[in-house]
Amino acid sequence: MEASDTGTSALSDRATVRRHPERAAYDRATIDAILDEALVAHVGFVREGSPVVIPLSYGRSGDTLYLHGSNVSRTLGALASGADICFTVTLLDALVLARSTFHHSLNYRSVVVFGKGRLVTDPAEKERALECIVEHIVPGRTRDAREPNASELAATSVIALTIDEASAKSRNEPPVDLAADLTRATWAGVLPIVQHYGPPIADSFVSAGLEPAETIVSYERPRAVPRER
């Protein structure tokens, strides 16, 4: 993932966090760290008058997010048409267990990006974008795996989305209980969520003795420490 060119996302009305604004962040370091750790984005747009939200893998290069899919995909066609896009990612860090059901919550980190998609037509940018997406999923993987051939490139569409209207929002707190509930004989606190990757499982065509790369054996997502409140 390349560093962004700007230090702060542009503040717009729709990207401004109003509910718990103290949990918001607009600096690109925070936004980029969350984008670089997450694996799946939920991309919302309107297609033929109806709202649609699709989960997609992605990659980030500087100030640009890249999405890809089949060139016959209605989703990619809609994103390439200049439709307004809402791109979101969420990382769950803990379950927040309060003394009342009303005050149960989640500790999380999230990013919302607004913008319009751009169909990538330059062949060199398209190849870089596809490499960016693969490297986002498993850093170093493009050194081992075959590059896409001409027919695979022709069958794939790539959409670019500039990160120029975005916000991050996070919660990293214990339960917030009413004073009257603090004496209840009910356990309260946080239950941390840890994403774990198991040992690699080779498919049946892997040659005997061929071991996975160290980047696979010791695979972990980049992790930014949640902000303390």
Please annotate each region the language model reported.
Residues 42-46, 99-101, 117-122, 142-149:
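Short helix-to-loop capping/linker segments positioned immediately adjacent to catalytic or ligand/cofactor-binding
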Residues 64-66, 86, 160, 169:
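General beta-strand recognition
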Residues 39, 54, 61-63, 81-85, ...:
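A generic structural signal for short beta-strands and their flanking turns/coil linkers
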Residues 1-15, 121, 125-229:
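C-terminal edge-of-domain segments
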Residues 71-132:
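Short, structured beta-strand-loop surface elements
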Residues 11-66, 77:
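An N-terminal domain-cap segment
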Residues 1-17, 60-72, 108-117:
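N-terminal short leaders/motifs
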